[in-house]
A protein has these predicted regions:
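C-terminal and inter-domain tail/linker signature
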Residues: 1-148
């Protein structure tokens, strides 16, 4: 498949809309930022492609990190692909992945690669440094690291 030709500024704008939607936990803004068949990899279990797969995740993040901020540290573009290195910060004020609120500040890295189609993000490969966050709050979700 041939890469769509877009400018660096168009690619950056598309990805910045996506991160604004995540930071604001705004599904309507996400629907404007991504294609209707947007793939988020690794895909949340039991969800089909598209922006609505983020509804429960946004709800959990709104409760867990209500003051969440996302700072884009680096953005690299090539053709219709954008690589992002960013940092999430906030206070774990509500349950997150089964861990009760700790009221502790957290800061962790995220790394993503995005594919752009029709001025929207059509595919995202995304990794978060959850281990760093778990170390900061002093707990891991039940079942992780138990050898089970």
């Amino acid at each position: 498949m041939e890469a769509e030709h877009i400018t660096q500024s168009e690619a950056r704008a598309a990805v910045e809309r996506l991160y604004a939607a995540f930071a604001q936990k705004d599904v309507n803004l996400l629907r404007q930022a991504v294609t209707s068949d947007w793939e988020y990899l690794p895909e949340p279990a039991g969800f089909k492609a598209g922006p609505d797969q983020m509804i429960p995740i946004f709800a959990e993040m709104a409760a867990a990190l209500p003051d969440m901020r996302i700072e884009i540290l680096d953005m690299l573009t090539q053709d219709n692909r954008v690589g992002v290195r960013a940092e999430v910060s906030g206070t774990q004020s509500g349950p997150l992945m089964g861990i009760a609120a700790t009221s502790k500040p957290v800061r962790f890295a995220i790394h993503s690669f995005h594919e752009i189609r029709d001025d929207r993000v059509s595919k995202t490969w995304h990794l978060e440094d959850w281990l760093s966050m778990f170390r900061q709050i002093g707990e891991v979700p039940r079942g992780i690291g138990s050898g089970a």
